Amino acid sequence: MKDKKPEHIDTKCHMIKPLNFALIGAAGYIAPRHIKAIADTGNNLLVAYDKFDSVGRLDSSFPDCSFYTENEQFDRFCSKQMRTDNPLQWVSICTPNYTHDAFIRYGLRLGCDVICEKPLVLNPYNIDNLIELEKETGHKAYTILQLRLHDKIRALKEKVANGPEGKVYDVDLTYITSRGNWYYASWKGDVHKSGGIATNIGVHFYDMLQWIFGPVKKNIVHVMSVDRVAGYLELDRARVRYFLSINAECLPANAVQGEKRTYRTLSIDGEEFEFSAGFTELHTESYKQILAGNGFRISEARPCIETVSEIRHAEPIGLVGEYHPLAKLPLAKHPFGWDERR
């Protein structure tokens, strides 16, 4: 159902006023895409917050944006702004995964609508709590599920929907995005903060697969270690073998020869589906859809959050049944000697 558009009409001059945004996590990896999306949609970034001060990226679009490295100062600014005739309307969140639900709650209680980077939350029960808070505050939270806006992926969904009724596709998903030792020292290397490999680098793929092929009927994990996860998903219209890794040693020979550090491929019934291009403007398109009342609400993220949560808590069964060919690769040790499964 289409949401009501935000009220930002200047009744005196009948012009659409720019919406005011606050950005939490301005120094993060994904923040530039949100900053660009706010600018590209003609809106205003009033204030930004991050514990780290490497935020020169603000200069290109919002040099007058207020910036704070202390949460208390940021909150003071936001609270004062809400009592003016030029209040904040939106809070965008680009922080580490484990903080998402807390900052979503902050934005809703502040009196704003919220846009949160994926994964929306780490656990399904967080979704229930946020839906209740939406009802209490009268404000809404949206998530970024940008693969649903990719032209080729939308075309694939339409092709499957219009294809033979009841056909079940055989799908192989491989995604290797090489990361160095820094990854393990950061919050991303801590399963309690990132959610693990499946959540941190794979949640958008699990959303895409279910959006196209239907809900998960069976969820099996074959291999899960500090740098990879491999498993099998049986969906309503697909049998999916997947392999996700951050270890460059897992890259296939053709990627290594081409000096590529990232390898992404999706095979459907033995035919490769290419969708590596076309990602650059998807955050801007996501913002356009959200601001037009067509964004992806909290409940739409539930299937993929449930899937990655089940994977995180699963006990790997080993190389049994329908496993991805790369699942056979030798396991690597944690670079710091830690044996905790991440």
Regions found by a protein language model. Give the residues of each.
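C-terminal helix-rich "cap/oligomerization" subdomain common to oxidoreductases
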Residues: M1-K17, C78-M82, W90-S92, K288-R342
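N-terminal Rossmann-like dinucleotide-binding module
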Residues: K2-D64
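C-terminal substrate-binding/catalytic lobe of Rossmann-fold NAD(P)-dependent oxidoreductases
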Residues: V229-E281
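Rossmann-like dinucleotide-binding domain that binds NAD(P)(H)
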Residues: N181-L251, R302-E306
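Beta-loop-alpha module in the N-terminal Rossmann-like domain of NAD(P)-dependent dehydrogenases
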Residues: S66-I131
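A contiguous active-site-proximal alpha/beta segment in oxidoreductase catalytic domains
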Residues: Y98, V121-N181
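Local beta-strand N-terminus motif with an aromatic residue
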Residues: L45, D64, P87-V91, E165-V168
